[in-house]
């Protein structure tokens, strides 16, 4: 017996025409880790048994859940997952986002079929397929001197038995691009005091030209499983509110962020991740700070300002949204 190696794992993804029905191109996801699993719920019988044994255990619901972790880069499948997170019309996993096209958070739910292959590198390949996988959460993290990393969480409506043969075949290879780092000047945070713009030119340096050492962006679609009588499979997956939160650490060189917190003053933030070759911009035109701390942690340390924030609904022109995503904006 040869033991399977995590280094030989491959994850394929395809869009779906309906919840649980794969359709279109199949692409390879580039990941650093994954935790995609079946989640089976059971109930135990309450029958009184004089032998003190539990008489039975029955399955009552079945779904999939888990996360994929990745190093953020210019990558077509990742683009389409981002579209799904935003509730925008789902694109092709082989094409990705269209350059210089706005993606606003909306109400269209997209789903994917994901197949995980594990292998011993010799004769045994095992395949787990999860259907109706709806993007639930996103966490992007950037810290000085590191890659920009991401985690996407899924909720799925369909779990299949493990097999030794594949049901998906990649039609498009993984895009070979270099992960974005925080060393590149195109990965940055910009500030707009007016709190009503998605025009790049309106965003400038942080107040007092403060320098950020880290930032994060979190998106939560508030998904919920919709169970049903007559089947252990989910009837569907419900969407809740589109919630955007984040954090930022800056050197404590200016009073603006602190006073914005005290006065609940709204402002705009632009989180840009990229390189000289490509970039992604996340516009948050109305942000409210929910926590600010300025602490002297100890000797031989810099004084830092730790900021937590939440983005709220904004109206810019005819668009009503919380976050706008644009790739390679002109």
PLM feature spans:
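Signature of extracytoplasmic/envelope-associated structural regions
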Residues: 1-330
């Amino acid at each position: 017996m040869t033991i399977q190696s995590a280094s030989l794992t491959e994850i394929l993804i395809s869009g779906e025409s309906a919840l649980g029905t794969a359709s279109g191109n199949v692409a390879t996801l580039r990941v650093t880790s994954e935790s995609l699993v079946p989640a089976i719920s059971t109930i135990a019988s309450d029958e009184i048994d004089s032998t003190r044994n539990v008489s039975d255990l029955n399955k009552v619901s079945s779904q999939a859940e888990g996360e994929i972790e990745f190093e953020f880069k210019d990558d077509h499948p990742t683009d389409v997952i981002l579209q799904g997170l935003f509730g925008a019309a789902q694109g092709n996993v082989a094409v990705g986002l269209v350059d210089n096209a706005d993606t606003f958070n909306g109400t269209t739910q997209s789903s994917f079929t994901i197949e995980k292959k594990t292998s011993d590198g010799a004769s045994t390949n095992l395949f787990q397929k999860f259907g109706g996988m709806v993007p639930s959460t996103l966490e992007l993290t950037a810290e000085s001197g590191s890659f920009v990393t991401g985690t996407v969480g899924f909720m799925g409506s369909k779990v299949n038995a493990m097999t030794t043969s594949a049901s998906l075949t990649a039609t498009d290879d993984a895009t070979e691009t270099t992960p974005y780092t925080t060393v590149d000047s195109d990965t940055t945070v910009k500030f707009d005091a007016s709190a009503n713009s998605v025009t790049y030119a309106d965003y400038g340096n942080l107040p007092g030209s403060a320098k950020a050492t880290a930032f994060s962006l979190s998106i939560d679609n508030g998904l919920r499983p919709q169970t049903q009588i007559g089947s252990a499979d989910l009837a569907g997956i419900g969407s809740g509110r589109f919630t955007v939160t984040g954090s930022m650490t800056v050197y404590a060189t200016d009073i603006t962020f602190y006073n914005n917190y005290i006065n609940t003053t709204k402002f705009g933030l632009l989180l840009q991740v990229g390189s000289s070759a490509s970039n992604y911009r996340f516009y948050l035109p109305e942000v409210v700070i929910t926590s600010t701390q300025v602490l002297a942690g100890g000797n031989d340390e810099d004084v830092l300002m730790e900021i937590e924030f939440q983005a709220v609904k904004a109206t810019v022109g005819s668009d009503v949204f919380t976050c706008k995503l644009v790739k390679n904006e002109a």
